[in-house]
């Protein structure tokens, strides 16, 4: 367990690993990260994933950011993420919307408000 290890997210953000658990049954590593970003916005999912890949020698397609929660004005975010052993396991367990979110693609929902105002 690498408790209290530091991870550099960007020039303005640094994370401290608060919890690192190996879940052998599922085939993933479950990490809780506290990110300090005083004076700047919440780091993007892509920045967090890049930092985790470097820190844990993993691959981008095996890391999923489950949740980023930031209190207004605090400059501190709590991040929950998973690192999987294989893409196959990841796709069976993680919801598709999270995979799309981490990849930077958006899911298109049923109707759109933009199309309602443009009539004939």
UniProtKB/Swiss-Prot annotation:
The stretch of residues making up the signal peptide is none
Ribosomal protein as a keyword? yes
Keywords for the protein's UniProt record, in alphabetical order = Ribonucleoprotein, Ribosomal protein
Region named Disordered: 101-120
Give a GO biological-process term: translation
SUPFAM superfamilies listed in its UniProt record: Ribosomal proteins S24e, L23 and L15e
Query: Among the entry's GO cellular component annotations, what is one?
Result: ribosome
Q: Which GO terms describe its molecular function?
A: structural constituent of ribosome
Q: Which domain of life is it from?
A: Archaea
Homology family: Belongs to the eukaryotic ribosomal protein eS24 family.
Q: What is the official name of this protein in its record?
A: Small ribosomal subunit protein eS24
Q: Which gene encodes it?
A: rps24e
């Amino acid at each position: 367990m690498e408790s209290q290890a530091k991870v550099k997210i960007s020039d303005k953000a640094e994370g401290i690993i608060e919890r690192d658990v190996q879940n052998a049954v599922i085939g993933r590593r479950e990490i809780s990260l506290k990110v300090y970003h005083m004076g700047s916005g919440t780091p993007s999912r892509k920045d967090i994933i890049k930092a985790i890949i470097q820190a844990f020698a993993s691959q981008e397609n095996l890391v999923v950011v489950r949740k980023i929660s930031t209190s207004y004005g605090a400059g501190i975010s709590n991040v929950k993420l998973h690192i999987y052993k294989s893409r196959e396991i990841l796709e069976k367990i993680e919801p598709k919307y999270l995979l799309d979110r981490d990849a930077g693609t958006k899911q298109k929902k049923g109707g759109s408000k933009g199309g309602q105002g443009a009539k004939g």
